Curated annotation (Swiss-Prot):
Annotated gene: rplR
InterPro entries linked: Ribosomal_uL18_bac-type, Ribosomal_uL18_bac/euk
Protein family membership: Belongs to the universal ribosomal protein uL18 family.
Subunit structure: Part of the 50S ribosomal subunit; part of the 5S rRNA/L5/L18/L25 subcomplex. Contacts the 5S and 23S rRNAs.
Organism encoding this protein: Streptococcus equi subsp. zooepidemicus (strain MGCS10565)
PANTHER family: 39S RIBOSOMAL PROTEIN L18, MITOCHONDRIAL, LARGE RIBOSOMAL SUBUNIT PROTEIN UL18M
Protein name: Large ribosomal subunit protein uL18
Domain of life: Bacteria
Sorted UniProt keywords: Ribonucleoprotein, Ribosomal protein, RNA-binding, rRNA-binding
Length: 121
């Protein structure tokens, strides 16, 4: 008899963690939410006003300014871009939503770059 132990799906666990955090976290017009999504090939960041349901600023590895480098280096550039675009629209304070990901690696690099370029969280 063969016993198979199924491994939990990492993305499903992340989504569950994200839903749990999102129940307590919301962005307003005064202090919007900086959301991060990480895929295998890229990283995406949006500044969202949850009350109006509007994206105020965004940046990703699909932008022309972000092309070369490692994934962590690209995350730094995305953090810089999203912060510059948010500050240009008069947004200085945000709520950081790590999307259920660990605050480490690419997510941390993006957050640090956003802080260095004028966003407070």
């Amino acid at each position: 008899m063969k016993i198979v132990i199924s491994k939990p799906d990492k993305n499903k666990i992340r989504q569950k963690r994200h839903r749990r955090v999102r129940g307590k976290l919301s962005g307003t017009a005064d202090r919007p939410r900086l959301n991060v999504f990480r895929s295998n090939t890229g990283i995406y960041a949006q500044v969202i006003d949850d009350v109006a349901g509007v994206t105020l600023a965004s940046a990703s590895t699909l932008d022309k300014e972000v092309s070369k480098g490692t994934k962590t280096e690209q995350a730094v550039v995305v953090g810089k871009l999203v912060a510059e675009r948010a500050v240009a629209k008069g947004i200085s304070e945000v709520v950081f939503d790590r999307g259920g990901y660990l605050y480490h690696g690419r997510v941390k690099a993006l957050a640090d770059a956003a802080r260095e370029n004028g966003l407070k969280f």
